Regions:
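Short charge-dense sequence patches
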Residues: 1-10, 50-54, 110
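Short acidic-aromatic low-complexity motifs
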Residues: 2-30
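Hydrophobic alpha-helical core bundles mediating ligand binding, dimerization, or RNAP-core interactions
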Residues: 8-11, 15, 31, 54, ...
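A solvent-exposed, acidic/Ser-Thr-rich amphipathic alpha-helical stretch
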Residues: 24-80
Length: 121
């Protein structure tokens, strides 16, 4: 795996990526084929499911509403896990709209095996 900061930067940027092909390729690089992305109200499984999840979030929050996702603070990781906080705010600037954190469990190949997403606000 590349260093944690680079990995997290790529992870955050995928949620802002407008190009579907670039999203698809990056998802395959970051997630294992049978990975799970879990949030309180949904479960996305495998590359196709995760691609749909990310594309849906992009369409709703970035493209339609003009927001951007970015890292909030530092990241931490050990024993094959990464913890990061993120925030969503208008791309043009303004107040933070939403805050959350993701906890990523990595496989032996350094790709995400399971990602847990928690919306805090």
């Amino acid at each position: 795996m590349t260093d944690i900061a680079t990995f997290v930067d790529r992870y955050i940027n995928i949620w802002n990526e407008s190009d579907p092909e670039r999203r698809r390729l990056t998802i395959r690089e970051l997630w294992q084929e049978d990975a799970h992305h879990l949030a309180r109200t949904l479960e996305a499984v495998g590359h196709a499911g995760i691609e749909t999840r990310v594309a849906t979030a992009y369409e709703k929050w970035v493209k339609e509403k003009g927001n951007v996702f970015r890292l909030r603070g530092g990241v931490d990781g050990h024993h094959g896990t990464i913890k990061l906080r993120w925030e969503m705010l208008p791309a043009a600037g303004g107040e933070v709209i939403s805050v959350g954190f993701d906890f990523l469990v990595l496989g032996e190949d350094g790709r995400i095996r399971t990602g847990y997403q928690f919306i805090e606000a």
